[in-house]
A protein has these predicted regions:
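Long, charged, mostly alpha-helical binding arms that flank functional sites
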Residues: 2, 222-227, 360-363, 369-401, ...
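Amphipathic alpha-helical
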Residues: 12, 192-222, 258, 262-302, ...
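Conserved oxyanion/phosphate-binding beta-strand-loop segments in alpha/beta enzyme cores
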Residues: 1-34, 64-73, 97-104, 208, ...
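Catalytic alpha/beta core of large soluble enzyme barrels
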Residues: 56, 69, 264-361, 367, ...
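Residue patterns forming the tRNA-binding/recognition surfaces of aminoacyl-tRNA synthetases
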Residues: 10, 14-18, 88-242, 246, ...
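Acidic, turn-prone loop/beta-hairpin segments
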Residues: 77, 434-438, 444-445, 451-452, ...
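Basic, alpha-helical terminal appendages of large translation-related enzymes
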Residues: 1-30, 258, 270-275, 353-365, ...
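N-terminal catalytic cores of NTP/NDP-binding nucleotidyl/phosphoryl-transfer enzymes
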Residues: 24-92, 121-136, 243-244, 311-347, ...
Length: 821
């Protein structure tokens, strides 16, 4: 048994001192390996982090040993609401809270023996980092990708602050428990919709899990259809409604708006319905968006007291708001055709709204009073004026052309994707670099004045916008006219920080630009990105958008940031995801203290393939610990030469383990190493064989590998040694088959012993002539393994053989006959 504590501390110190994992541009082929950087929470490293980093580090070590110039950095996604909440609850400085957590987390990561280039570390809350968030914002602003418009937000009147969705609990403010209402405020947006088509199209080029690509496709949500204008009654104003079914337009009997639609509050202002509609809105907007649109969710709505005109019939139709309509689809307003849409049908029945049939099956007649459910299939148009008798496919085109001629509609492509609202009424984020001047309007901060730093004279009360408290921050001269003006007091969404951090890693010390084009063009794209499926949409989509926008700003030559993506599975205990509330958390540091980092890493990679969830097992961790101690004991029995069979099996092992690790089948690779280690302990193996075996276990158990590598007399590091190459000419198929045959014969003898109940038999083995030599070579091994008094081997054609029961004739190739007495 080796002292894992001493060994792990020793090699972590040696790695740090020698800086063997430091990376720079060189002539080697590069490989950028990256895990999603963590938020430095107060709870520190959990088992999900540990799995993520163990996967990433094993792969980085493997690629490094293959001669790649590995970029493998780590940093911290350090802005965010938890730090601000801690400041409000405990009067703790968010900066101090965050850096204390970073220090703890970094120490925990170091104990795992991760091979990061720590010289490239970033923390997004440092001015040296968020200065470049602001710089990128200014470039986006110049290009028209950053703009300001009104948007609906959750607002707490009591705290006088905007709330994130997660801060609204059952319709109330998380802090004061007063009711939250929807309010329209001027907000900053990034124009991600400019890239909707490219974001969709380029998914096909990525080596990502199909389910992640499907999630992004659905989020972008491309639809081809018709944009139709519905004029408001007694007004020149109109709604644009997107529909994929213009053929049903004559059957539209009401409109339904999303409760969040900014025009709703305009329409009801000063009307008798205003208070009731506001109550309805506040009730609906706190519901989960996905649940609102679920098929089995009850559909409910409210008439807002206003009407629109059907553009083809000029009929007055009522306007409703309803829970099942979202701003995320189309224009946030739908035309309801209850005869031909089941959801609209149910809603119309519930609120006694007209149902008008405009499509019937060929040769059949439908009537509204006998309609039990919506008719949603194709058919022939009726009740549609000059378009009667057209088939639905033709009618779609003809009605769209007709609307276009009247300037009441046009063919269009719509995306579910919406522009990215980046404004946050928070302190602990990147200040938006904008100044408002009453004479000059919106003025971007000059680049030479970056970074706009967060003020430190803030009291965290949880009320109002924190930055607006600081007079020294807010009051500033206009960069254009020099008169007194006001700074923007919103900060950026923290997803901005993580949308380009992988680019900063390429050039972390650059104080002139976010990164140099040369560095990024060398290291990017990330060859292998590793992180949770929960980031499949927002983070990964925003990072892709940033990369494309920065390309168009000539800051890099790159279309996509991440070539390959691996989404690791959850770690469960007792069949549930680990969480403090469930009392089923296993602390990685406790496991490291008890068994060592190598045991923890190897267990995590052994128990399941990376993309699968796995169940924690105390017995499993103990089993791996025993295996590593046995592996260490292989140092004790090194011979001067290899058995030929060992040479063959070693080269087969190298080939298999290499391919398994390349394909992220770490569990299969570890099992193969275990099997070979168990096999070889009873064979003659030389120093070279053990050396290669040590290098193969190095990605999983790097400390143990370094120690054993050194014990064999090596002065170099195992971590940067060359990966073993399989010599296929040394793989001897026949020899391995023969040995397998001997192994199976031993099992057969043991089974016969049980059946005839002989403890120490005389064993007679009858083989075909060409197998006589291999069995004679293994006689002693068979004798020991089967506890036989003696073992005799005969060729089946040997006339002098001892064969009292006439067993010899039963012998077959690789299947000897056996007799015990």
């Amino acid at each position: 048994m080796y002292d894992f504590k001493k060994v792990e501390e020793k090699w972590q110190n040696k790695w740090n001192k020698s800086r063997i994992f430091k990376t720079d541009i060189n002539k080697k082929k590069k490989f950028y390996n990256l895990e999603m950087f963590p938020y430095p929470s107060g709870s520190g490293l959990h088992m999900g982090h540990t799995r993520n980093y163990s996967i990433g580090d094993a792969y980085a070590r493997f690629k490094r040993m293959h001669g790649y110039n590995i970029l493998y950095p780590m940093g911290y996604d350090a802005f965010g609401l938890p730090a601000e909440n801690a400041a409000i609850k405990s009067n703790v400085d968010p900066k101090k809270w965050t850096f204390n957590n970073i220090e703890i987390m970094k120490e925990q990561q170091s104990k795992l023996g991760l091979s990061y280039d720590w010289d490239r570390e970033v923390a997004t809350c440092l001015p040296e980092y968020y200065r470049w968030n602001q710089y990128i914002f200014l470039q986006f602003y110049k290009k028209g990708l950053a703009y300001r418009k009104e948007a609906m937000v959750n607002y707490c009147n009591s705290c006088k602050t905007v709330l994130a969705n997660e801060q609204v609990v059952n319709g109330a403010c998380w802090r004061c428990h007063n009711k939250v209402e929807l309010k329209s405020l001027e907000q900053w947006f990034f124009k991600i919709t400019d890239y909707a088509e490219e974001l969709l199209k380029y998914l096909d080029k990525l080596s990502w899990p199909e389910r992640v690509k499907v999630m992004q496709r659905n989020w972008i949500g491309k639809s081809e259809g018709t944009l139709v204008k519905f004029q408001l009654e007694n007004s020149k104003d109109y709604f644009e409604v997107f529909t994929t079914r213009p053929d049903t337009l004559y059957g539209a009997t009401f409109l339904v708006m999303a409760p969040e639609h900014p025009k709703v509050l305009e329409l009801i202002k000063g009307t008798k319905n205003e208070n009731d509609v506001k109550k309805f809105i506040n009730k609906v907007v706190i519901e989960d968006k996905f649940l609102r649109t679920a098929e089995d969710k009850e559909k409910y709505g409210m008439f807002i007291g206003k009407y629109a005109l059907n553009p083809l019939t000029n009929e007055k139709i009522p306007i409703y708001i309803a829970n099942f309509v979202l701003m995320d689809y189309g224009t946030g307003v739908i035309m309801a055709v209850p005869a031909h849409d089941q959801r609209d049908f149910e809603f119309a029945k519930k609120y006694k709204l007209p149902i008008k049939i405009v499509i019937t099956p060929k040769g059949k007649k439908l009537t509204s009073d006998k309609l039990k459910q919506a008719y949603v299939n194709e058919g022939v148009l009726i009740n549609s004026n000059k378009f009667n008798n057209l088939l639905t496919g033709e009618a779609k085109n003809e009605i769209t052309k007709h609307l276009s001629g009247l300037k009441l509609g046009k063919k269009t492509i719509q995306y579910k994707l919406r522009d990215w609202l980046i404004s946050r009424q928070r302190y602990w984020g990147t200040p938006i670099p904008v100044i408002y001047c009453q004479y000059c309007g919106i003025q971007p901060v000059l680049e030479k004045d970056l970074p706009v730093k967060l003020p430190e004279d803030i009291k965290f009360t949880g009320q109002g916008n924190p930055l607006s408290q600081s007079k020294s921050f807010v009051n500033v001269k206009c960069p254009k006219c020099g008169k007194m003006a006001k700074r923007e007091t919103d900060t950026m969404d923290t997803f901005v920080d993580s949308s380009w951090y992988f680019l900063r890693y390429c050039d972390p010390d650059n104080n002139k630009l976010p990164f140099s084009k040369k560095m990024v063009n060398y290291f990017m794209p990330v060859n292998q990105y590793i992180g949770g499926i929960e980031h499949a949409i927002l983070h990964l989509l925003y990072a892709r958008f940033f990369t494309k926008a920065l390309r168009d700003l000539k800051m890099l030559n790159l279309d996509e940031p991440f070539h390959k993506l691996l989404t690791q599975g959850m770690v469960l205990k007792n069949g549930e995801v680990m969480s403090k509330s469930k009392g089923n958390v296993v602390d990685p540091l406790e496991i490291i203290e008890r068994y060592g980092a190598d045991t923890l890493r190897t267990f995590i990679l052994f128990i399941a393939s990376p993309e699968k969830q796995f169940e924690w097992s105390d017995e499993g961790i103990e089993g791996i610990n025993k295996f590593l101690n046995k592996f260490y004991s292989l140092l004790e029995n090194v011979s001067k030469k290899n058995d030929l069979i060992v040479e063959s099996k070693l080269n087969r092992l190298i080939k298999k383990v290499t391919q398994d690790i390349e394909d992220f089948r770490f569990n299969n690779a570890i099992i193969s190493i275990m099997e070979f280690s168990e096999y070889v302990k009873n064979k003659n193996y030389n120093k070279d064989t053990l050396e290669k075996l040590i290098l193969m276990i190095s990605p999983f158990s790097p400390h143990l590998a370094e120690e054993m590598h050194e014990k064999l007399g090596n002065k170099s590091f195992a971590s940067i040694s060359e990966w073993p190459k399989a010599n296929e000419s040394k793989i001897n198929e026949n020899l391995e088959k023969e040995e397998e045959s001997v192994s199976n014969t031993i099992k057969d003898i043991l089974n016969i012993k049980k059946l005839v109940n002989i403890e120490n038999p005389k064993t007679y083995i009858y083989v075909i002539p060409k197998e006589l030599e291999i069995y004679n070579q293994n006689k002693d091994g068979i004798k020991i393994s089967t506890s036989s008094k003696d073992v005799k081997v005969y060729a089946v054609n040997d006339k002098l053989k001892h064969d009292p029961k006439n067993k010899a004739h039963k012998a077959k190739p690789n299947k000897p006959a056996i007799y015990l007495e």
